[in-house]
Curated annotation (Swiss-Prot):
Binds 1 divalent metal cation per subunit; can use either Mg(2+) or Mn(2+). Coiled coil: none annotated. Its EC number is 3.6.1.73. It holds the Pfam family NTPase_I-T. HAMAP family: Non_canon_purine_NTPase_YjjX. It comes from the Archaea. Belongs to the YjjX NTPase family. Signal peptide: none annotated. Keywords: Hydrolase, Magnesium, Manganese, Metal-binding, Nucleotide metabolism, Nucleotide-binding. Substrate binds at residues 7-12. This is Probable inosine/xanthosine triphosphatase. It comes from Sulfurisphaera tokodaii (strain DSM 16993 / JCM 10545 / NBRC 100140 / 7).
């Protein structure tokens, strides 16, 4: 089996590899840099659209059996800005599924930078005086000190993939 992920982000690629290992799917994984078709910091529904676009763009750019798109986004709910991700999986036969990560609230110090036009990763780097946090621990890692960005993505990758390995009508 050949799986293409529509991102070269290290945390996303490693999450897909770990998820495939957990569910026992023996697959070669390739990461491809594809367009999401949404803003660099998606909000709410844009996040879903970006994940779907990445999955299909990865599928179309390769000869993969499954294309996977992971898009991180932010949504405003109950006076809080919440960060979350959408994972979308699709194949060329028309099978598709999606899932969401857990959502977590962002402190105002980060939200302020995001509302000024920065991505969450940039805001994280500024607040925590680091570089390329989105390739590693991510905002979730710096905020919780125990959950990494890779770990945040593993469960929704598994949930998005279940129709591809657990054939239930």
């Amino acid at each position: 089996m050949f799986v293409a992920i529509g991102s070269t982000n290290k945390a996303k690629v490693e999450a897909v590899k770990e998820a495939l290992k957990i569910i026992g799917l023996n697959a070669d994984v390739i990461s491809v840099n594809v367009e999401s078709g949404v803003s660099s910091q998606p909000f709410c529904h844009e996040t879903f659209v970006g994940a779907k676009n990445r999955a299909y763009n990865a599928l179309n750019a390769t000869n993969a059996d499954i294309g996977i798109g992971i898009e991180g986004g932010i949504c405003y709910y109950e006076n809080k800005y919440l960060a979350f991700a959408v994972v979308y999986a699709a194949n060329k036969e028309g099978l598709e599924n999606f899932s969401f990560s857990m959502a977590f609230s962002l402190p105002y110090s980060m939200v302020k930078h995001i509302l000024e036009g920065r991505e969450l990763g940039e805001a994280t780097d500024l607040i925590f005086s680091t570089k390329d946090s989105k390739q590693h621990e991510g905002a979730i890692g710096y905020l919780t000190k125990v959950i990494t960005r890779k770990e945040l993505y593993i469960q929704p990758v598994i949930a998005a993939l279940y129709p591809f390995y657990n054939k239930i009508e």
